UniProtKB/Swiss-Prot annotation:
Keyword annotations: Antibiotic biosynthesis
Biochemical pathway: Antibiotic biosynthesis; curamycin biosynthesis
InterPro entries named in the record: Cupin_2, PKS_Associated_Protein, Polyketide_Synth_CurC_prd, RmlC-like_jellyroll, RmlC_Cupin_sf
Protein name: Polyketide synthase CurC
Domain Cupin type-2: 42-108
SUPFAM superfamilies: RmlC-like cupins (SSF51182)
Family annotation (Gene3D superfamilies): Jelly Rolls (2.60.120.10)
Region (Disordered): 133-154
Organism ancestry: Bacteria, Bacillati, Actinomycetota, Actinomycetes, Kitasatosporales
Keyword Lipid metabolism on entry: no
Biased composition annotated in UniProt, kind: Basic and acidic residues: 143-154
Organism in which the protein naturally occurs: Streptomyces cyaneus
GO biological process terms on file: antibiotic biosynthetic process
Annotated Pfam families: Cupin_2 (PF07883)
Length: 154
């Protein structure tokens, strides 16, 4: 049996993913480090920026705000989040993040367990906000092993 080896991944090594809002960097993943139980990343949001509403049908999401002030909508209810606070988002709970502060916000996120396939792990429920540096993309949900929730865009 092969033994996994530790690997350090620098945030600068990871291409930004801006298609759902914010600058999402998935650092520690099955692809980057051979993770088998989940993945971890960093969300960077400019003032006024948001990450569009979505949910995870197979994973809990753990977040920790490193800097800045955020609001998170959890199944339609809004909660404040600030630096040095953490939050656990249960499986199937819709959520959206907004930077409501005057400075950049940084939030570490971890999802576990992994979905059976990457395409099943994230379900968009609204279109992303379009900014100057991101183009609109079609919201197409791939094949799913679980029923969609009402209101899911497809």
């Amino acid at each position: 049996m092969d033994k996994m080896r530790p690997r350090v991944v620098d945030v600068k090594e990871i291409e930004p993913n801006r298609k759902r809002g914010g600058d999402l960097r998935t650092l520690l993943t099955p692809v980057t480090v051979g993770a088998t139980s989940g993945f971890m990343g960093l969300a960077i949001m400019r003032p006024g920026e948001r990450i569009s509403e979505h949910y995870h049908p197979y994973s809990e999401e753990f977040v920790y705000v490193v800097e800045g002030r955020l609001e998170v909508d959890l199944d339609g209810e809004t909660f404040p989040l600030r630096a040095d606070q953490g939050l656990m988002i249960p499986i199937d709970m819709r959520h959206r993040f907004r930077n409501v502060g005057d400075e950049e916000a940084r939030m570490v996120f971890h999802l576990s367990p992994l979905a059976p396939k990457p395409s099943l792990g994230h379900v968009d429920t609204e279109a992303p906000a379009i900014s100057d540096d991101v183009k609109a993309y079609p919201l197409v949900q791939e094949e799913s092993g679980r029923p969609e929730r009402p209101g899911v865009l497809s």
